[in-house]
Amino acid sequence: MLRIENTVCKSACRVDSATAQPVYSSFDGENFKAEIHSKLDSFERKLNASPTYRDEEGGGNPEHYETLSQEINDLQSQIENLSLEVENLQGSSSSPSNVAAALAELSQSIRTIKEQLEANRKERYNLTVTVANLTAAVNAAKKTGSESTTATATTTTNYETQLKAFEAQIKALDNQLQTQKNLVQTTSVEAKNDRDSLRKTIEVIRLTVKTLQDQVESQTGPKKRRKSPIENQPTAGSELATLTTNLTFLTQRVEKLSQGVATHTTAMFTLEETMKKVHTTLQEATASNTNNIDAIRTRVQELADKIALFDQVQYSVGYEMAKKNPDSTKLRTDLDSAISTVNEEKKSLLTVKDSVQSLKTQLDELKRTLENDGDVSSLRQTVHDMASSIRDETATIYNKINALEEGLKRGGQTTTTPLTQLQTRVEEIDKTIVKWNNQHGEWTTRLNKLEAGVSNNQTLMNRFIQQVNGDVNPLKELPAELETFKMTITNTWAQLNKKFLDFSAKTDTSVDNFTKKFTEIHPQIASLVDKMDQQIRDNPHTTEKLMDEIRQLKSAMTRLGTQSSGKPIFSINTKSSYNEKSKKTIFGHPGIIFPETVKISSIYITLAAKEADGKEDARLFELTATSTHNNITSTIKQFEKKCTEETILEDYNPPLVIDAQTKLVLSCNQKVFGVAIFTLQYS
């Protein structure tokens, strides 16, 4: 439903693009009224002359679509022309702008109706063509069925089925056609309603014109009184009306800003109260915790003095023990235990020192943060000064406008200069308020940041108090702990000193006894030495024989590999077992696996002898190793022996090295019976 609201015509005003100053033009009410009446009468005559509007039943008949479409095009063209003319009138006067908007809306509605009618016309044409095609197909099918004399009964039945299907399709299309007709009728009714709406719009425009006429007559009509000088100015009344409107809008904005100023002032007062509470709490916490921190420092210093004393005692004891150089394993153990205890106390002392320093740093930082509240006071003063200035300027402008209105009512002499000055001042205040609006967001952000900072500082302060209380409570027990530690040091030193004196006394006694015994046995030792020298001189061959035996023993030890490891030598005995699949004799079937790296110094084999027959006079022995990680087999040693040999000895210098987790297998290419002995040593 289209709607055009009544508006009040005001004096024409435009802005000069070169000077950016308002320029007012004169208003001719009679010519404006005549032009508007002429356009409205012409438009109404053309609308009433429409055949579809006079004949409501014809409007729902699809046969009148072409005529209706042409009439709608004409109406649209006329409305667009009227809209352009109204826009031209707006360029020279202050006629209502919403009239053009309403006409544009009406034009859009007519274009929509036209598009719907065009779509319905195309759909109707497509349906007509479809019905014609189906009808021709049915007639052809009927004709073919009647003229065919050779078709079977089955074919006739098929034709009848197809014919029924065609009839059903025709019926469905008829229903669709009827639906489209109903839709077209509905669309026509909507078009009629739009025309009724247009007529109502014209009546509204007539009322608007009548209102304009009344206003023009009220300003230009003949009145038998003397005109005031301000009425002789063609633009004075319009300037005063414009200024009053601007001032009303400005007053509303100032009231909103004043409310915002009051809100922010309240927020700043709340912020100040919060900061005062934080200051008070901080001072109380500082007063109560400063004494605790001083007490902690005093106790820590006492503990440090005790530890320094123990370090000195430790050095003295160590020096005395080093000078005496006794066998004091137990004494050294006790001293190390005491030193370890003192070192643990040192770590605790350093932890307490760091905690006290950290708490002191947090307290100082909190003080500096809360004392830096100058931004809040400066911001509050700026907002207060700005609000006061705007209120004073607004009151001054109100007084001047009231004075001008009183002068007009009394018919006094006035000029447009005060009005121009007031308008200029209003524009300056408006710019100031816009600038203040832009700064308002920044001030709000700064206030929020300051409030958040105070909240964070309050949280830090509470956390600081908890930390101080948590650290001070354990330190209240420090005097007792220090006294206990002092007693421990005293007792430990007394025990160590007693043990040291006892050990020194025992050492002196032992030295005296040793000296006495040495004095007693020295002649006996000298006599034995003389006898040994005489025996060596008497038996020169005995020494040479002994040296030969030593050399032979060293050679045997070298062959056995005893010099390469301090671990004992051992042996493993393995029995022979013949494998039918591989046709080999295996010693230690299925193999030997050692947990560590092992060295083989010799292999000793005893076998049953066999007479040589000329065919097999040699036996091949093979020592192989298989890794348990990747199942790779490698040959370590091979050797051949005659079949007549009963004992076989293989010495290895250097020994054969077998890696850990490796399976060791000794095999022979012939079937033999015997035992193999491995001489081994772990690396």
Curated annotation (Swiss-Prot):
Q: Region Disordered: what ranges? A: 213-237
| Positions in coiled-coil regions | 62-124, 155-259, 346-376
Keywords for the protein's UniProt record, in alphabetical order: Coiled coil
- Could you tell me what this protein is called? Uncharacterized protein 049R
- Originating species: Invertebrate iridescent virus 3 (IIV-3)
Organism lineage: Viruses, Varidnaviria, Bamfordvirae, Nucleocytoviricota, Megaviricetes
